[in-house]
Amino acid sequence: MASIRDVARKANVGSATVSRVLNNSGYVSEETRRKIEDAMRELNYTPNELARNLFHKKSGIIAILVPSVSHPFFAELVKCVETELYARGYKTMLCDTFREKNSEQEYLDMLNRNIVDGIITGVHSLRIEEYTKIDKPIVAFDRCLGENIPLVRVDHALGGRMAAKLLLASGCKDVIQFQGAKSVRSPSDIRHIEFERVMKENNAKVTSVELMWNRFDSEYFSEVTEQTMREHPDIDGVFGADLLAVYCMKAAIAQGRQIPGDLKLVAYDGTYVTDAVTPGITSIVQPIPLIARELAGLLHDMIEQRPIPQREKLMNVSIRYGNTTIGKN
C-alpha cells in the first residue's frame, strides 16, 4: 500500500507538500498540485481519512438521535438522512433513545468532546438547557430546543385541519384521535388542537386518547387501540399516526365493522405501512425525503460555519387518498 512518502518521491516533492494538498492547507502551485494528484492516481494512493479528520479537528461522523428505529416514520427518516449525509461526505452513528435510557446525554457529551461533528435529534428526554448550553452544531426535527438550534418541521396545523375535513366530508360525527403525552410539549401538538377545533365547529364529537410518553412499540399500539375500540364501539372515525390507524382498522374488522362504511380512518405520517394494508389508509403525508434534505443541509452549513438565516424551516404536508374515507381516491 502506497504511503505519503511514496507519493512525494513519485512527484519529486517533499512529504509536507503532499500533506498540504491532502489537507487543502497552505499554498501549493497548480503545477505541483497536478503532479501530486497524478502520482496519487498512479500509485492508487488512498488518504488516511482518520488522520485527515484529526488534522481538521473533525471526525466526519454525525449522530442521529431518534426515539425508536422500529417506528416506521423514524425508520424512513433515518434512512433518508443517512443518504443525504453520505452525499455530503459524512458517516452516521445511530442512537435509539427508547432502548438506551442515558444515550441522549452521552451523545451530547460526545459532541462536546469532538467525537462527532454534529447531532440531528428527534428526541427530547433531556431538559432544553442541556442543549442550549452547548455551542456546537445541532439541528432538531419537530423539537423546540431553543432559538439558537435550527428546527425542521411540517405545518402540523394544516395537517390537523386536513384530517378533520376528510372525516367531516365522509360524514363522521363521533371520532377518536390519538395524541402524545401532554406532559411533553412538541410542535406536533397543534395538529390535535386544530383537528379538534375544526371537528367541534362542525358539531362533531371528539374523544382524545392520550398515549404514554416515549412508547413507540407495536405491542403498546396494539394494546391501546384494541382497548379504545372496545370502549368506544359507536365511533365512526379515527385520526392517529400510521401504526395507530392500522391497528384500529385491524380491531374494527375483528369486531365485524366495515371500512369505510362503519368506520373511517385518517392516518398521519404517510409511511409505507398505510399502503401495505387492505384497504389502503387515507393519510396526511409528511415529506420525509425533503425533511431529511433540510436536516442534513442545515447541519452541514453549521459545521462549515455558514450563516443560517432561517432558524425554522416549515414544510407542507399533503393528502394521499386511500380507501378508508369517502370521496376522492
Predicted feature residues:
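Short acidic capping loops at alpha-helix termini that bridge into adjacent secondary structure
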Residues: 174, 206-208, 259-264
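N-terminal helix-turn-helix DNA-binding module of bacterial transcription factors
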Residues: 1-59, 73, 329
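Hinge/beta->alpha junction and helix N-cap segments in small-molecule ligand-binding domains
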Residues: 67-76, 94-102, 152-162, 178-224, ...
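Alpha-helical recognition/docking segments in bacterial nutrient-uptake
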Residues: 2, 60-165, 227-234
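Flexible loop/turn connectors
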Residues: 226, 230-239, 243-329
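Periplasmic-binding protein-like
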Residues: 108, 116-122, 176-179, 232-243, ...
